[in-house]
From Swiss-Prot:
One of its GO terms (molecular function) is acid-amino acid ligase activity. It holds the Pfam family Mur_ligase_C. ATP binds at residues 116-122. It comes from the Bacteria. This is UDP-N-acetylmuramyl-tripeptide synthetase. The modification N6-carboxylysine is found at residue 229.
Amino acid sequence: MIRLEQVIEILKKDNNFREISSAGEYYFNWPKEVNFDQLSYDSRKSTENTLFFAKGLNFKKEYLTDLEAAFYVSEFDYEVALPAIIVTDVKRAMALIAASFYDFPQNKLKTLALTGTKGKTTSAYFAKAILDKMNGGKTALLSTAQTTLDGKNYFKSELTTPESLDLLEMMAKALTNGMTHLVMEVSSQAYKTERVYGLTFDVGVFLNISPDHIGPVEHPTLEDYFYCKRQLLKNSRYFVANSEMNHFAIIKEELKERKIPHAFYGADSENKIIESKGLHFVTDGSVSGAFDIRLLGRFNQENALATALATKALGASLENIHDGLALAVVPGRMELLTAKNGAHIYIDYAHNGLSLENLVEVVEEHHAGQLVLVLGSTGNKGESRRKDFGQVIEKHPRLDVILTTDDSNREDPKIIADEIASFVSRTLDFELDRELAIKKAVSKTKSTDDAVIIAGKGTDMFQLKDGKRQPYIGDTAAAQKYL
């Protein structure tokens, strides 16, 4: 429960309160006592004692006409019968009010947050596995792939980083379930849309940066994308960063000026990988030792080193790190199937140019024969990925490419595929039915030297079409049908 008086106090303290508007009159304080027993931004879940948040570009006045709620919070006075708390920024208001409503659960958990263009989910699972070794399985996880609030039951995540109200509720549930630590991915959109406003993380990790999510719906420029991701730095008590990442200089400069304790990793830093072979690697620095992970590729080993440094800052021992990394399983990341002819089928969530480039390089290194890539690109977001995908394909002439559908949403998947192909000088294959594309790819293999890469969806069991999730068998099940 939270009192209206508390809500007003929170907003005033954040310089985010304009007035209360009711029946044509304006108030700087409310003369009556009001208690809210629920917060919501979904009109279908609102009740008579709910504090409702009217947010979103498409919010309409008619949503409030028959709304069952006590008050609503908005940047705009809709002049309806329901009293309104008018604010400058409704998303910031929701974040701070939710934190108070749920009794500041973020202060009772040890939190580790990860950002970067690629590797967030893999690193999140690495970190959870290490911390579980340290705390006996009491680590909650919020990732692109899955969410768990009790360490046992997992469910599919709707967003990489949930809306602030949902996020604070999840943190509170994790505490109730006995969790002591939380590992979560923080997207650039989370900072752009204030989903993590007011949160300070115990440890923040910045893995890498490359152009992605650039377009009219998400970030207009790379600068905006990078700036939003960089907000994790000033909202972390300790920070881990990749010294080999693009634009590292400003990260280093900002950390120094803000006097934030930190650790760097990479070839030109104290913490580095000095030996790498298959699933095994050796590190030097503050977490020096020999480690094994279940994923191929040096980039995965670099993510493991990043999480080793981050979890060490939370108290994990070298033994915890060693044992956790060895056991970590990441759903939808380089998931491996073997066809009857011995060919390998790799299923991976790689959904931007940098992730695809790293994935292709690893598979090329281990397979000398036919390499078939099944790939699509999302509609109505991340438009810059199409050029990036085309450039990766052009760079790797060994790839036999089948372009297909991947969450085309309100765009024509053939137009998306054509755009990818426009950046490639050789002829590509098209099969817009994703399952048939996978069938065709597997049929092209003959021996253990051959491999198929199915990129983009990982464990997703839906296709986004016209704004709705439509059932899809899933890449793994589709591939298994034709092994």
